[in-house]
């Protein structure tokens, strides 16, 4: 229990792509009610939204979800692209193990500040999956090496085979939803009641 004998509250955010927009609506409602968690755990889009929540970036998240398009997250050919370009795109996606998510990486780089995230009063945890072993990695922020938070957030959202696995220090990771799409157990391990 927390020092004032109130339960430690957690917000658990699942993965699921477009579900992320609903999470921002829940965030608004919770804020209007004056409810704040001490812990946020997330998988995939839930880990990305959780990081923005921990940084109190509601307007940024809302605006992003109101305007986001598929090409804002992954490299896609233009709608009027010639057939040869579409063929090359599909061949690249298959041979490279999924679509290129450079646009998503750029959003994460621009929006999320690791130093501020580490100083947030809200503790963050995420789930990703090692591609080789298919074992879940439950990672409270404090267990993630300095300079690697953005990488692990992207790894948590690497929805293979549609998107490429995310490699960190020679280890490839997949979307945490393959093993734990709703990381309540991680929230409990981090102290939630």
Where are these regions (language model features)?
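Patatin-like phospholipase
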Residues: 6-108, 136-154
